[in-house]
Structure formats: structure tokens, C-alpha cells
Amino acid sequence: MFATSRPGLLHPLHAILLAFPIALFTGALASDIAYLNTAEMQWSNFAAWMITFALVVGGPVLLWSLMLLLRRRNRGPARLYVACFAVAWVLGLVNAFQHSRDAWASVGVAGLILSLASTGLVLAAGWIAFSATVDREMVR
């Protein structure tokens, strides 16, 4: 019996930090949907806070990802991961500006579309990053 493992795309600390933007952008999307269904202004505040914290934690993740891209020889998955995360971070920044407006005008169609796009891209980035590790065991 032997096991082989291809090195993963992420360092364990990088993976832990990546989990925050994934959860927070998803939570912000859920808060936007709750706001649109209830018109309770606190949901818009929750979304703005989650987007802001996702950007704060996502900044170092993005820098680490760019350094990862520069150091990799096989850049295929790393390039796609960095592209998805970078676009998600920029859309999240635009979304933070959108959510900083008056609560009645912050979510609407534009806020919801930005939340959907940033959530989808950060989920795709997480999927790419966490599926890059391959472990194989062979029993003889």
C-alpha cells in the first residue's frame, strides 16, 4: 500500500483565511434577500458589515494568492483561482460602496446583482482552491 499526494494549491493558513470571504459574501447575499423580503433595514446593515469584513480579510488572501501565482510553475488552476477571487473582491468593493448608501436604496437590483456575482465568484474560487489537492491511495 502506498499513498501519493500532489501538493495542494493553498497553504493551510491561506485556506482558513479564504473561508471567511466565502462565508461572509454568502451571508451578505442571504441578508440582501432577507432585506428584499422584509424591508427591515437592519438586514441591509448586516450585509454591509459582512461585505466590509469579507474585504478586510480578503485583501491579505488576494495578496497571498498573487504571490502564489508568481511562485507556481503549473499556473493553470492558480491563475483561474486568482482571477475569480480578484474579480469577486473588486465586485465586493463596488458592492460595499453600493451598500453604504441609504438603506432604502442600497440593496435593490444593483446590490443584489453585485452580491450574487461576488458570492458566485468567491464560491468558484474556493471550489478551485480546495479541489486542487489530489490524494490517491493504492492497495496491493
Regions found by a protein language model. Give the residues of each.
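Alpha-helical transmembrane segments of multi-pass integral membrane proteins
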Residues: 15-28, 87-90, 117-125
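Core segments of alpha-helical transmembrane spans in multipass integral membrane proteins
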Residues: 22-31, 48-69, 83-93
